[in-house]
Design a protein with these regions (language model features):
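N-terminal export signals
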Residues: 2, 7-23
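N-proximal helix/coil linker or "cap" segments that precede and/or mark the start of modular domains
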Residues: 20-43, 111
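A short beta-strand-turn-helix
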Residues: 43-64
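Conserved hydrophobic/aromatic "anchor" residues
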Residues: 44, 68-69, 112, 120
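Short pre-active-site segment immediately N-terminal to redox-active cysteine/selenocysteine motifs
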Residues: 62-64, 69-72, 138
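Structural microenvironment flanking redox-active thiols in thiol-disulfide oxidoreductases
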Residues: 77-116, 126-131
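Short, internal strand/loop/helix patches
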Residues: 112-147
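Thiol-/selenol-based redox modules, centered on thioredoxin-like
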Residues: 147-172
């Protein structure tokens, strides 16, 4: 069998053997794409784990970092320490941060935050919040909303520590 044909057969067999779990869930496949820079980003109210309530008007005229995450997400585990560092370093300079968790149960997210000692403002995504502000495709998802209410930056997947810390440039 010629090499090109053999390679095609091997590649086809490998693709057919991919397990179902390697494919995105139906919900993830239907998730919206990341918003484009410059587009308006409407917000929705949500109860934070600390008992306070995030109201969209809090973000008026402020830079907001939205960080969707989950306790079971390995990439979130790599990014979250740097989100915490960003929060600690920049909150006094006007940074607003909201970290909605997509865990199935809010207690899993609360426990994770406690175990890791994270203090960044986090919440659990309720169906109402998801309808108003659907999580874009990917995880983690990090979106920076500028003072004017428009997307300044949107990223899906792991960010390097320097990329997370560079989000502070949007405060200038």
């Amino acid at each position: 069998m010629p090499i090109a044909r053999r390679s095609l057969v091997v590649a086809s067999a490998a693709a057919a053997a991919l397990p179902a779990w390697a494919q995105p869930s139906a919900a993830e496949a239907d998730a919206p794409a990341l918003p484009r820079a410059g587009t308006p980003l409407p917000l929705a109210p949500i109860d934070r784990f600390d008992g306070s309530r995030f109201e969209p008007r809090e973000a008026d005229g402020r830079v907001l970092v939205l960080y969707w995450w989950a306790s079971w997400c390995p990439f979130c585990a790599l990014v979250s320490p740097h989100i915490e560092a960003l929060w600690r370093q920049e909150r006094g300079k006007g940074l607003l941060l909201l970290a909605p968790s997509i865990d199935r149960e809010p207690q899993a997210a609360r426990d994770y935050l406690t175990r890791r000692g994270y203090t960044f403002p986090a919440a659990w995504v309720t169906p109402e919040f998801q309808r108003a502000l659907p999580k874009p495709r990917g995880l983690p998802v990090t979106i920076v909303r500028g003072r004017d209410g428009r997307v300044r930056q949107a990223e899906a997947g792991q960010l390097f520590p320097e990329d997370v810390m560079a989000l502070a440039r949007h405060l200038q």
